Amino acid sequence: MRIAIFENIMTPGGHEVDFDRIIVEEFRARGHEVVFFVPENFRFQFDYKTPVGRLDGEAVTYSKSGGLRKLFAAAKREINRQRWYSQLFARQSEFDALIIPTSTHRYLRALNHSVLRKIDKPLSFILHGINPTESEKFFDAARKLLPHSNIRMVVLTFGNSIFGKKLDNVFPIPPPTYTPRDIDFQPSENTPRGALKIGFFGQYRREKKLEALLDVYLARQYKRAVELIVQGSTMHDEDSRDFERIIQKYADHGITFRHEGLIGAEWQRAIASVDALLMPYSAPRYRYHWGGMLFTAIGYQKPVVASDDMNPEVFEQFRIGETFPSGNVDELGRVLESFINDFDQNSEIYRRALRAAAEEFSPKNFARRLENIITREVCNG
């Protein structure tokens, strides 16, 4: 089949780029041809080595907009979305199936007012999770699309329903792991003999309360050598200055800081270089949206310390690390201390669980599940 991907989200890198890459490379491995359709001004941050079709209408970014500008940008994006949908419908002879890899209920709402809903080819919208507050909007839009059986909503989640609800055009499947694709890497089968390297990676923003985390880490007692590596990329000057202040403040505390953005092979080498990953993020949305860093850890088979609202279904099935009660800083310190001190005796437990999780959520299995949804029998409604 010739699989088309419609991508309209411009990002400097990270999980969005890697997710598209999974679709491209895994579907190619299954014998399919892949092409992209993108807005006229779209700039790729990675060369997927695929043909590209351009659509009239500029991609809109919210990164530097606020207030009225943000409202104007949102309105402009909705207008352009209808233009893109119409053009995709007109060009459907150029592909056998269409995937929109990062969608929300707004995409479906717009589809209900577009000729694209009558497409003759399988069209799959991938939603990366659904919050309780938006579930009714999602189901309302999905119900209206039931007469159009070429339209499928693929929800990345755990289980076979969305808050106990099912529709014939909604397909829950597990998300894929992120794996090293540009470096030679084999998961370690040995417990580290030197210092246990724990990585805390991601974008730094002042509201993340990094200093509280560092103070908790430094206050505990460890029975083995340990090194904390903190990587932070910053988008705004005020965040950059604040991160530099923190680096200076903790310069003599045995913590390694990396103030830089990491993409591609650099990012992969950084993840591969540590023994475990720290994920202290606490927010209700993590219960409903799959964690990109958690599925990076599984893909690289790195044990984790994470809050208990980080995809709890995964931890119920696989002991890939330890969790602490979300938002409880004291418990984070206690769990982190025991994780480090007991790492040697628990490492084989983690390894077995990570191998099993990596197989269950592998990119190969993800592509197989998505292909099954795309190729299922359809009849135009």
Feature-to-residue mapping (PLM):
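Nucleotide-activated donor-dependent transferases that construct or modify glycoconjugates
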Residues: 1-13, 102-104, 199-200, 278
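A short, glycine/small-residue-rich beta-strand->loop->alpha-helix junction that serves as a flexible
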Residues: 7-21, 44, 205-208
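A charged, aromatic-enriched C-terminal amphipathic alpha-helix characteristic of glycosyltransferases
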Residues: 14-15, 327-330, 341-377
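Glycosyltransferase donor-sugar binding loop
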Residues: 42, 227-243, 260
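Nucleotide-activated donor-binding/catalytic signature segment of Leloir-type glycosyltransferases, i.e.
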Residues: 240-268
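Nucleotide-sugar-dependent
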Residues: 279-295, 307-309, 313-314
